[in-house]
């Protein structure tokens, strides 16, 4: 006689909210290098939104601000 365990519900991970939406959320600005550097990996690449939980619209704004800051020399393209 074999016993089967009751089917378990899959682990549910709560979706994180976007850090740029809300009443007192920071504004995305290309001059704010401290804020932008939190969304760049240790290799200098832009971290995807599925990791940072940034909404699609704000991720596009963030990527544009990072690219502007790189072009102006405020952020490096590659970190060695």
UniProtKB/Swiss-Prot annotation:
Q: Which residues form a coiled coil?
A: none
Which keywords annotate this record? Ribonucleoprotein, Ribosomal protein, RNA-binding, rRNA-binding
Q: Where does the record locate the signal sequence feature?
A: none
Per the UniProt record, the source organism is: Methylocella silvestris (strain DSM 15510 / CIP 108128 / LMG 27833 / NCIMB 13906 / BL2)
Quaternary structure, from the entry: Part of the 30S ribosomal subunit. Forms a tight heterodimer with protein bS6.
- Which InterPro entries does the protein's record reference? Ribosomal_bS18 (IPR001648), Ribosomal_bS18_CS (IPR018275), Ribosomal_bS18_sf (IPR036870)
Q: State what protein this is by name.
A: Small ribosomal subunit protein bS18
Gene Ontology CC annotations of this record? cytosolic small ribosomal subunit
> Which family is this sequence assigned to?
Belongs to the bacterial ribosomal protein bS18 family.
Q: What does this protein do?
A: Binds as a heterodimer with protein bS6 to the central domain of the 16S rRNA, where it helps stabilize the platform of the 30S subunit.
Q: Which GO terms describe its molecular function?
A: small ribosomal subunit rRNA binding; structural constituent of ribosome
- The record's disulfide annotation reads none
GO biological process terms held by the UniProt record = translation
């Amino acid at each position: 006689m074999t016993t089967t365990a009751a089917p378990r519900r899959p682990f549910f991970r709560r979706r994180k909210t976007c850090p740029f939406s809300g009443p007192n959320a920071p504004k995305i600005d290309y001059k704010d290098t401290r804020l932008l550097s939190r969304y760049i990996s240790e290799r200098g690449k832009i971290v995807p939104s599925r990791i940072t939980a940034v909404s699609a619209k704000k991720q596009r704004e963030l990527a544009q601000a990072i690219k502007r800051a790189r072009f102006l020399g405020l952020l490096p393209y590659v970190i060695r």
